[in-house]
Swiss-Prot record:
One of its GO terms (cellular component) is cytoplasm. It comes from Bacillus subtilis (strain 168). This is Acetate kinase. Mg(2+). Can also accept Mn(2+). Induced by glucose excess, the induction may be mediated by CcpA transcriptional regulator. It catalyses: acetate + ATP = acetyl phosphate + ADP. GO terms for biological process: acetate metabolic process; acetyl-CoA biosynthetic process. The gene is ackA. SUPFAM superfamilies: Actin-like ATPase domain. One of its GO terms (molecular function) is ATP binding. Its EC number is 2.7.2.1.
Length: 395
């Protein structure tokens, strides 16, 4: 038996989950928030109860030391020698990393070298990696990349129709994200369907505040909706998804905003928030539609119809589909979004049961038994995928 800790470091946060492997039992999980800001918050769950402490945590290294102290203080582990491996979520692996990788000084430098591809995320991920390396230098650590799963996409999927030298010189191409989640739910779908993954054509819909759709054929990603950055694809909580690129100079001219300001609007003030005018939270939007709010209704329809279009396009791309999977916060919990996305897909063999769809947050088939295309809800588990990769690579 081994104990593996899965880490997701943000710019001012650190999420953690400790697993007993290979049973995949979760021993504890928690979150450090507001790192480097006054009144940092440390939350850890012990025997199902949440313990919260407000204190000053100036940087990630202090957060890591506090986390490790709490593991022993609460008796979750006897001492730090019990930790056999650390898995770090890293958002962007570029073209360099098509699989998770054991972290060495060399691989850390390579991750730093591609940080410009994900300036909001990778630097924070690296801070987390270095903080653990400082405190537990001899424990094997693994980086698990959001982009790695999509490195199987063929050229016709990942190339933009731009001058080819942009790709050669600057690495401008589609990378795709949420790969760890898409990989988990498609592997789990094969288990639930009782069929080999290599024989399946699957469409995975990871719908959270960020959302992406993936076409997975024979267990390999062949296309996905996000692009060079996580801004592309479907409309999201605050992100615009795909727009006409010529809009950017047009908006700059009309509003007097700089390019960075327009980009900030596309990333943080668009999507559900932009259209509804009041919230990026889908639950608020759904409630408002029940009260007759027309802008909320429009926001919900835009969100669902973009997903609906990707499903149709990916089914065409794979010459059919065996199952459609809904996952992540919205995909797992929003009865209304699933209903709107699936409406009208009967022409391609999708027959779903409204009664079965009335489920939240648990594994379920929501299609009729006779439906040629199965529709499934599979709660994602990116952390367990990280732990599995640590076990696989740190042997």
């Amino acid at each position: 038996m081994s104990k593996i800790i899965a880490i997701n470091a943000g710019s001012s946060s650190l999420k953690f989950q400790l697993f007993e492997m290979p049973s995949e039992t979760v021993l504890t999980k928690g979150l450090v928030e507001r790192i480097g800001i006054a009144d940092s918050v440390f939350t850890i769950s012990v025997n199902g109860e949440k313990n919260t402490e407000v204190t000053d945590i100036p940087d990630h290294a202090v957060a890591v030391k506090m986390l490790l102290n709490k593991l022993t203080e609460f008796g979750i582990i006897k001492d730090l020698n019990e930790i056999d491996g650390i898995g770090h979520r890293v958002v962007h692996g570029g073209e360099k990393f098509s699989d998770s990788v054991l972290l060495t000084d060399e691989t850390i430098k390579e991750i730093e070298d591609i940080s410009e591809l994900a300036p909001l995320h990778n630097p924070a991920n690296i801070v987390g990696i270095k903080a653990f390396k400082e405190v537990l230098p001899n424990v094997p650590a693994v980086a698990v990349f959001d982009t790695a799963f999509h490195q199987t996409m063929p050229e016709q999927s990942y190339l933009y129709s731009l001058p080819y030298e942009y790709y050669e010189k600057f690495g401008i191409r589609k990378y795709g994200f949420h790969g760890t989640s898409h990989k988990y739910v498609t592997e789990r779908a094969a288990e639930l369907l009782g069929r080999p993954l290599k024989d399946l054509r699957l469409i995975s819909c990871h719908l959270g505040n960020g959302a992406s759709i993936a076409a997975v054929e024979g267990g390999k990603s062949i296309d996905t909706s996000m692009g060079f950055t996580p801004l592309a694809g479907v409309a999201m909580g605050t992100r615009s998804g795909n727009i006409d690129p010529a809009l950017i100079p047009y908006i700059m001219e009309k509003t007097g905003q700089t390019a960075d300001e327009v980009l900030n609007t596309l990333n943080k003030k668009s999507g559900l928030l932009g259209i509804s005018g009041f919230s990026s939270d889908l639950r608020d939007i759904v409630e408002a539609t029940k009260e007759g709010n027309e802008r909320a209704e429009t926001a919900l329809e835009v969100f669902a119809s973009r997903i609906h279009k990707y499903i149709g396009s990916y089914a065409a791309r794979m010459s059919g589909v065996d199952a459609i999977i809904f996952t992540a916060g919205i995909g797992e919990n929003s009865v209304e979004v699933r209903e709107r996305v699936l409406r009208g897909l009967e022409f391609m063999g999708v027959y779903w049961d409204p009664a079965l769809n009335n489920v939240r947050g648990e594994e379920a088939f929501i299609s009729y038994p006779h439906s040629p295309v199965k529709v499934m809800i599979i709660p994602t588990d990116e952390e367990v995928m990280i732990a599995r990769d640590v076990v696989r690579l740190a042997k």
